[in-house]
């Protein structure tokens, strides 16, 4: 999409309103990296945005693959963990929201 009054500019909407941002970080996840090693829960949610590579989110007994330039909101009350899903490094932004 190109926003109004922009030229030679392309954008991809990653997410809309998701809550209040608590904090954020850039993660560099190496081959076979991720965590935590056991699924966990908490009160806040995670918004993950993959900028390089590919991430695999384990959600209870299912998994979700997040490709480069995609985002996914993980509800904190659902048991989850996050892992690199490629043979190289995955880089992603994690934003904690409530």
Q: Where do the model's predicted regions map?
A:
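A short, N-terminal "cap"/entry segment at the start of jelly-roll beta-barrel domains
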Residues: 1-23
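Conserved short histidine dyad/triad with adjacent acidic residue
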Residues: 12, 26-42
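Short histidine-centered beta-strand/loop micro-motifs
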Residues: 16-18, 36-42, 83-85
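A generic "binding-loop/recognition-motif" signal
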Residues: 35, 43-44, 62, 78-79, ...
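Histidine-centered metal-chelating micro-motifs
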Residues: 36-37, 56, 72, 76-81
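Glycine- and acidic-residue-biased ligand/ion/polar-headgroup-sensing regions
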Residues: 44-55
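Short acidic-glycine-tyrosine-enriched beta hairpin
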Residues: 61-76
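Ligand-binding loop in jelly-roll beta-barrel domains
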Residues: 76-98
């Amino acid at each position: 999409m190109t926003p109004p009054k922009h030229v030679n500019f392309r954008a991809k909407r990653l997410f809309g309103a998701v809550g209040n941002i608590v904090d954020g970080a850039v993660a560099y996840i190496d081959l076979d990296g991720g965590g935590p090693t056991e699924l966990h829960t908490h009160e806040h949610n995670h918004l993950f945005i993959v900028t390089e590579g590919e991430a695999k989110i384990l959600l209870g007994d299912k998994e979700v693959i997040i490709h480069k330039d995609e985002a996914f909101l993980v509800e904190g009350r659902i048991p989850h963990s996050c892992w690199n899903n490629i043979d190289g490094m995955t880089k992603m932004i994690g934003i904690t929201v409530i």
